[in-house]
Amino acid sequence: MRHRNHQHHLGRNRSHRRCLIANAMKALISHRRIETTLSKAKVLRQHADRCITWAKKETLAGRRRLIADLMVTFNSLTPKEARAARQLGDTSAYNDDRLLFQRLDRLVKDFKDRQGGYTRIVRIKKRRGDGAETCILEYLPVEEPEEEPAS
């Protein structure tokens, strides 16, 4: 029986949905915020929190899980070639594994003391063309500890 075995399909088949989630996750990790529809944001929030949790464990299995979920391709570009591609707006810049994992490690440092709930969804407006609810999915800002005034 398939009780409680529900998944949000987002109007796409399995391979298209997997690529959509992976590309949106790469953009979210790179920019810390993305604008998308509400239904996509609800699905991406689960994946974003799971990515941070796996990265925080710092195990080989966690690293491999991230590589598989984010569909990271290891390109053989030199740093100079990668920089030139990024300046030209080439999408292979998203597949730069070093850059992606550096930003992910920075997120892990920001959330090292937090036990989940790393993202938030802020609804903004309905899209003009089709009336879909749009929102901003973002990682929470880093809370700096407040210094107590010296008396």
What are these regions (language model features)?
Residues 2-9, 19, 23-151:
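Structured, basic alpha/beta domains of bacterial-type, RNA-associated proteins
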